[in-house]
Amino acid sequence: MSSTKRQKNRVLVKLKKRKVRKDKIEKWAELALSALGLNNVELSVYITDDQEIRELNKTYRKKDKPTDVLSFPMGEEFGGYKILGDVVISQDTAERQARELGHSLEEEVKRLIVHGIVHLLGYDHEKGGEEEKKFRELENYVLSKLSKAL
């Protein structure tokens, strides 16, 4: 009889911009993955600037402008983990949005991490209709779980 060893999720964080602490980003991502019932997954989160995310947005989405968050799904297995993918966040855009929405940069980065993870799971709010509804419901569910856990 074989048993599957349950592993913790692995979150890798790279910071080009450093206004939000790495340990907080790791914790938020780990809590989000847990709220979604995901196990043995690896997620990368990269905090960058408008210039770099604009280049990524232009290359991968053919949109020559900065955006708040991009998600790059992987789905491969490596070292006992399913590599969920990469979430890339522009701290510059996150700062502007936080000011516009009247909350902290940390709150906005937390929201964007969750938003990016929901995209990695295959949901797409840009399709509108029922797909957008499912996306928003899942995003709000995870954000409420994070609020209760923090």
UniProtKB/Swiss-Prot annotation:
<keyword id="KW-0255">Endonuclease</keyword>
<comment type="function">
    <text>Single strand-specific metallo-endoribonuclease involved in late-stage 70S ribosome quality control and in maturation of the 3' terminus of the 16S rRNA.</text>
</comment>
<dbReference type="Pfam" id="PF02130">
    <property type="entry name" value="YbeY"/>
</dbReference>
<keyword id="KW-0698">rRNA processing</keyword>
<feature type="binding site">
    <location>
        <position position="115"/>
    </location>
    <ligand>
        <name>Zn(2+)</name>
    </ligand>
</feature>
<comment type="similarity">
    <text>Belongs to the endoribonuclease YbeY family.</text>
</comment>
<dbReference type="GO" id="GO:0004521">
    <property type="term" value="F:RNA endonuclease activity"/>
</dbReference>
<dbReference type="GO" id="GO:0004222">
    <property type="term" value="F:metalloendopeptidase activity"/>
</dbReference>
<keyword id="KW-0378">Hydrolase</keyword>
<dbReference type="InterPro" id="IPR023091">
    <property type="entry name" value="MetalPrtase_cat_dom_sf_prd"/>
</dbReference>
<dbReference type="GO" id="GO:0008270">
    <property type="term" value="F:zinc ion binding"/>
</dbReference>
<dbReference type="InterPro" id="IPR002036">
    <property type="entry name" value="YbeY"/>
</dbReference>
<keyword id="KW-0479">Metal-binding</keyword>
<protein>
    <recommendedName>
        <fullName>Endoribonuclease YbeY</fullName>
        <ecNumber>3.1.-.-</ecNumber>
    </recommendedName>
</protein>
<feature type="binding site">
    <location>
        <position position="119"/>
    </location>
    <ligand>
        <name>Zn(2+)</name>
    </ligand>
</feature>
<keyword id="KW-0690">Ribosome biogenesis</keyword>
<dbReference type="InterPro" id="IPR020549">
    <property type="entry name" value="YbeY_CS"/>
</dbReference>
<feature type="binding site">
    <location>
        <position position="125"/>
    </location>
    <ligand>
        <name>Zn(2+)</name>
    </ligand>
</feature>
<dbReference type="GO" id="GO:0005737">
    <property type="term" value="C:cytoplasm"/>
</dbReference>
<dbReference type="GO" id="GO:0006364">
    <property type="term" value="P:rRNA processing"/>
</dbReference>
<keyword id="KW-0963">Cytoplasm</keyword>
<keyword id="KW-0540">Nuclease</keyword>
<keyword id="KW-0862">Zinc</keyword>
